Amino acid sequence: MDRGAGILLPITSLPSKYGIGCFSKSAYEFVDWLKEAGQSYWQILPLGPTSYGDSPYQSFSTYAGNPYFISLEALIEEGVLTEEECDEADFGEKPGTIDYGKMYESRYPLLRKAYERSDVSHNPEYLRFVEENRWWLSDYALFMAVKDRFGGVPWTEWAEDIRFRWGNALDYYRRELYFDIEFQQYLQYMFQKQWRELKHYANENGIRLIGDIPIYVSMDSADVWAHPELFQLDGENMPVAVAGCPPDGFSADGQLWGNPLYRWDYHRQTGYQWWISRLEYSFRLCDVLRIDHFRGFDEYYSIPYGEETAVNGHWEKGPGIDLFRHMERALGWKEVIAEDLGFVTDSVRRLVQESGFPGMKVLEFAFDTRDSGSANDYLPHNYIENCVVYTGTHDNETIVGWIDSIPKEDLESVRDYLCDHYSPKKQLYKSLISMAMRSRAKLCVIPMQDYLGYDNTCRINTPSTVGDNWKWRLKGGELTDKLTDEIHELCKRYGRLNWSNEKSTVPDEDEEDAEVE
């Protein structure tokens, strides 16, 4: 990974006339803009289909893509939808936000129409996709079709025969729900087709894609339903223990995530085959992967199932470096960003260092006056080169919102570090972005909202809350020429410019000959 810069913007946050960011013309225009702004990377959030709460970190599958990302414009061009049909659908009235309720009610009927008009059963490309991805697609498509048949309830509430995947039940539902299953396969085919076209365009224009995979999978997922042996489940396929975080200075109860925990002894016996397959597949979709909650590979927090808080949990040992040695032997060296934030011990630091993966630094964590002063790991003078610096992540306040919310003494600490006691408070975000850009971190990634100077009304997610998360998106027109030039200049000034996209200033041989003549 060369010294460079990137921008964090979820696919959902792209502007769109149809209610949510997707693989439409806006995505290609954003790639063009990244190129003009001197960027090398576009970081996104997990691509999977979201469940209740709309979090991309709680997905129905670790392999499937979110059908909401399928471009309706592309389906119109293909002739399987009309512009009138799409314009008549109600996706919500606010251009800068996402109405997931209306999205569910309007998007799927349109996608179903597109499927019914596509005649995919005679499409060789579709048939090849289904065959090549049968190892995960078959279970996922059946899972989604059965879930729809049971009114969307979790698989743990399905009828006993299909809940436990008895052979006769699997055969029955595959016959009974044939067209619903084919519809789900069609959605994944279109997702993959459009995503690969977008990725190819980005790579052709010098932009690499940073994907994101959660360490855990959702209990209500095709993965747990189809492969209960991978997880800490009891005889009824219910969790024995679930994931979360212990109490800390921010939460007296800790965080209860509820994801099933892995049976790491079983994974070790199989040579981590499921994990290797998961990572290999994810690297087909993205150039670099950020692995969420990396500290969970060193130690993970185990909470007895049924607890209402995380107070009674305890730490257990994870697979450690063994998993990543197996990964490298199977896949070769891959570019990973280790999300090593939160409660970090010396053991976690050793794992990150031993893996060789860059860890993460977040400027918003650097100026807490209750913390370790100048020894704070997140202060730029303490960075090593092999790290990725962010002003904030999707889980943090925007940098402007953070400046507005921190205590007075922390704000003074910011000004002291910047040697800036006179700039208006509303302009400090630019100084913090510049500080991140000039740090020795190999890669600097800035959330789009921070470059735009937006406050917390444009925050992506507030952990441990529900309701207004994952909804923000660009309206269109915000990425002005002035902003483009400012970001390009920052990249050039601090040695992060993507030179592969810069026009050469050296004349070619024909031009030189013409000058001589």
Predicted regions and their residues:
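Outer-envelope exported proteins of Gram-negative bacteria
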Residues: 45, 208-210, 214, 288, ...
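Conserved alpha-helical elements of sugar-nucleotide-dependent glycosyltransferases
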Residues: 26-27, 194, 323
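Surface-exposed amphipathic alpha-helices with a cationic face
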Residues: 35, 195-205, 328, 352-353
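Trp/Phe/Arg-rich N-terminal binding region typifying the photolyase-homology
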Residues: 1-80
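In a subset of proteins, long, contiguous C-terminal domains/tails are tracked
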Residues: 454-517
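Alpha-amylase-like alpha-glycosidases and glucanotransferases acting on alpha-linked glucans and related
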Residues: 10, 16, 54-188, 217-445, ...
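Conserved, well-ordered alpha-helix/loop/beta-strand core segments that scaffold catalytic motifs
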Residues: 184, 188-217
